[in-house]
């Protein structure tokens, strides 16, 4: 079960989330609905660790997610999947993953290899398609 209590997230002086609370029960579908700028994406990014909460609680399977790295949250079973399908169509799946890892890694050779292995561990389907051109992936596969 995912439980969010009194969640506050701010961007400078702008309070994007102001005391949001809800519970998403296991086996149930929960939706987040709101107008543009209402904070839906901020909520999802905060739950997945991509934004820091100023205050409040987020628990998943009775464990706190507050302050955890996004990678740790993904390993626990929660991932933020952006709406876009941004891939470089002319490159292979493996080359796209390598390009994506360049933006977050410091020690190029070993860290890139590790990043690719982590992605394949999370998404074995991409490992099967590693040599395939990324432009031939389905929409869902591109979001992996």
Whereabouts are the PLM-identified features?
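The feature captures the beta-strand-to-loop junction immediately N-terminal to the Walker
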Residues: 33-35
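Conserved ABC ATPase signature
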Residues: 133-137
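Short beta-strand immediately N-terminal to the Walker A/P-loop
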Residues: 30-31, 80
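ABC-type ATPase nucleotide-binding domains, specifically the catalytic core motifs of the NBD
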Residues: 12, 30, 68, 93-114, ...
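Conserved ABC transporter NBD signature motif
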Residues: 56-65, 76, 110-116
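Helix-to-loop junction immediately C-terminal to a conserved catalytic motif
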Residues: 48
């Amino acid at each position: 079960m995912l439980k969010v209590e009194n969640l506050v997230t701010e961007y400078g002086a702008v309070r994007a989330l102001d005391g949001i609370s809800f519970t998403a029960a296991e086996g149930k579908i929960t939706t987040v609905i709101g107008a543009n700028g209402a904070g839906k994406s901020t909520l999802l990014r905060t739950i997945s660790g991509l934004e820091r909460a100023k205050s409040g609680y987020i628990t998943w399977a009775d464990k706190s997610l507050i302050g955890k790295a996004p990678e740790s949250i993904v390993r626990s079973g929660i991932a933020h999947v952006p709406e876009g399908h941004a891939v470089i169509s002319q490159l292979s799946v493996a080359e796209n993953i390598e390009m994506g890892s360049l933006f977050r890694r410091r020690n190029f050779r070993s860290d890139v290899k590790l990043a690719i292995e982590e992605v394949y561990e999370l998404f074995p389907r991409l490992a099967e398609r590693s040599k395939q051109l990324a432009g031939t992936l389905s929409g869902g596969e591109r979001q992996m």
